[in-house]
Amino acid sequence: TFREVLQINASHPLALLGMARAAEFDGEPSAKELAEQALAVNPNLVAAHVLIARLELEAENYEAAVRAAERALETNPSASGALAVLATVRYLADDRAAFEDIVRRALERNPRDTELYDGLAEMAVRNRRYAEAVEFARRAVALDSTSWRSHGILGINQLRIGEIEAGRESLERAFRGDPYDVWIKNTLDLLDTFERYREVPSQRFRFILYGEEADVLAAYLAPLAEEAYDRLAERYGYRPATPIRVEVFPSHADFSVRTVGLAGLGALGVSFGNVLAMDSPSARDRGTFNWGSTFWHELAHAFHLGMSDHRVPRWFTEGLAVLEERRARESWGSDVSPAFLAAYKQERLLPVSRLNDGFVRPAYPEQISFSYYQASLVCELIERDHGADALLRMLDGFRRGLGTPEVFRQVLGTDIEAFDRRFEAYMQERFGGPLAAIRPRTARDTTQAGPDDAVRLASREPDDFVAQLRAGRTLFNAGRRDEAVPFLERAKELFPEYAGPGSPYDLLARIWREKGDLRRAAAELQRMTALNENAYDENVALSEILEQLGDPAGAAAALERAVYIYPFEIELHERLAALYARTGEWEKAVREREVVLALDPVDRAEAFYQLALAHFEAGDAASARRAVLRALEIAPNFERAQELLLRLRSARGSTPEGGR
């Protein structure tokens, strides 16, 4: 292995290059440093210069990418990878004359140089230009019909733009020529599973849903999608072409294969433009992600990509998409965490001028999630100081080929370094209190201490959020609930935005519920569920409490939030149906009764009867009759179903001719 070689010779340039390539594949920030180490030993190592050029291009550092590519070409004027980087930069800058000149130079040296077009296609993908990737791959195939890699790149990108059958044909051709390509094999295996999926259409969407989950997910996803499209279209003054294809995978490994070809992708969803792919709620542990906000986020990308002609930088579209989540529903979208504020205080967050690096080449595991939230705050600040229209004008600037510094100057009237300083001030303004309450931790602070030690530390540090929360948690876990309350209240006062697991809201709600103080418990849970989009158990608990307090509408709203976290618990839908019956919202009750049936209840006769009753109360006698007959097919002696059928017949007999 490369590591074994480096143990013998720590300066072996090819081993360093191999490590750099592995790091590039894994998205690790060490890739560039390893390539530079290889060049320190051998400055003429063309492949290392090309690798650095690719990394700079991916980070949208175009001038640095050109310099690295030109260094490679000084040693080898025919280096296809370097020519591909130069051609990509010219292509992205809309300099078609220079682009075609580079392509001509490359093909004069090697008329069948598919590597050039393969490289162009792959770099188009890195810049989210999927349609262009298809065209470049087609050019490669036209040059050499036996370039199996080119056929594979073509097929993968045809799938990304929704050309499913054409993509399959290209991938099968690639596999016949090279049956050892793992990416191609995995993707073909995934396509074979599509026969188990159902296509569910709505007005502007085509949902590709796993058969067993289709009826449950479609009941919520279809109306959510149409609502999101309308709201985003109104905000952006733009309407993506329809139908938009949405693929929802019950296996995260399958989602990873669909998006990158290999299992292991950490994302929840991906937008290729008018094709979206995402995890089903069944692909993750309950309470770990919100599939409703994930869909809204990915659809927002479809608008941003379309408006900018797929030229929006990663940091800006991610920040805007998180902002759109927050606008969509209370609690949706990333929220501030103690770890984020600690990273800010430790100067581990990137300046806005380098924020893209946090997405494409993170330096530590949490940096991607921190960058999502930071980017949303940047967009929030821009909207506050320059108006919502400024965000639209920035998208237009990117569409016109401007880089981030130029967009800041032209649209916001500031250079990006000055904006960095404004963002620093905004962080203090927005989170001044919590920032002051996040203190540096020492080894002594983080050791497991007993309740009395935790209380002593918290008493000495009344303005330290972590010390207060630790004291409250430790006392809570020790069963000393009354003593825990003042520490939890103080922690909440110091950092009211924090609502993660084990937050003050969570523990206080449990304390008040145990004591029978349901109103105080409800108040804590209402605040927590307004901040935490993944709080499934807390929403269910809040619903139970609000129902006890005589608030069926509030109880139903809490369960609606829970549905977008995990919709596959049958008891949740039975409760929600009963709540909508109490509030007289019979169409929603019908939806819930249909979902109960989709989840295969033990007593299907009862489930059909309850559906029939909901249809009857909603005024749909025909659907009620069909459902009650299904109940009687299963249980012919079901008395309540028989009585309902008689009521339906009686109502039908008294309905004027032509009535429903």
Show the residue positions of the predicted features.
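Structural signature of tandem alpha-helical TPR/SEL1-like repeats
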Residues: 1-4, 24-37, 58-71, 92-105, ...
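Conserved structural position within tetratricopeptide repeats
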Residues: 3-7, 37-40, 70-74, 104-108, ...
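Juxtacatalytic substrate-recognition/specificity segment
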Residues: 7, 33, 40, 67-68, ...
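Short coil turns that delineate tetratricopeptide repeat
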Residues: 10, 43, 77, 111, ...
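Helix-start (N-cap) detector for alpha-helical repeat units in TPR-like alpha-solenoids
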Residues: 13-14, 46-47, 80-81, 114-115, ...
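Pan-zinc metallopeptidase signature
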Residues: 352-470
